[in-house]
């Protein structure tokens, strides 16, 4: 981000060009923090965090609940294409937790309309947790992983765009059975 909190293409290109970075994921939403941004207290913003995040050392680092670079499905896809280009062609995609199914369908429709496809989509389950999420939201916001993954796969398949991207899962996938059951979808 630049000092105003907006996307900085030059800084992104510089960072994404690092050899260790193999792909770029845009976090649209997360099951445990639906509709919430985050605050890293200034006391935890040391010199290294300040350098990496591009924020002043010792000041609260506020991550907004939304992206300033896009606000519609079409803009999300255009932004995905832009970061793919700025990263030198590295795979680019996004992560989201299914909340309102019609919103995911709108993204699918925008793929068809624009002919822009992410390289991957990561479906996060409502049961995914984070220490930064409100306790009331843990395990209760969005669609659980299995249902969300199945919905996304079927929506992409039904719209004829599933073959354009990989679909991955993110949530409480901790055992061999969890992995096998998601792969079976």
Model-derived segments and spans:
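Active-site-facing alpha/beta catalytic cores
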Residues: 1-110, 117
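Glycine-rich phosphate/ribose-binding loops and adjacent secondary-structure elements
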Residues: 67-185
């Amino acid at each position: 981000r630049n000092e105003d909190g907006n996307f900085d293409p030059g800084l992104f290109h510089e960072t994404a060009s690092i050899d260790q970075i193999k792909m770029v994921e845009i976090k649209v939403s997360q099951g445990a923090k639906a509709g919430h941004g985050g605050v890293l207290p200034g006391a935890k913003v040391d010199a290294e965090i300040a350098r990496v995040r591009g924020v002043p050392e010792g000041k609260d680092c506020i991550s907004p609940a939304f992206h300033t670079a896009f606000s519609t499905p079409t803009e999300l896809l255009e932004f995905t294409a832009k970061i793919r280009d700025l990263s030198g062609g590295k795979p680019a995609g996004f992560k989201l937790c299914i909340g309102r199914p019609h919103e995911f369908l709108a993204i699918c429709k925008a793929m068809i309309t624009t002919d822009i496809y992410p390289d991957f989509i990561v479906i996060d389950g409502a049961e995914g947790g984070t220490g930064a999420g409100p306790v009331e939201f843990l395990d209760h916001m969005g669609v659980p992983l299995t249902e969300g993954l199945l919905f996304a796969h079927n929506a992409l398949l039904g719209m004829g765009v599933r073959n354009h991207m990989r679909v991955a899962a993110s949530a409480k996938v901790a055992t061999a059975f969890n992995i096998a059951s998601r792969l079976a979808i």
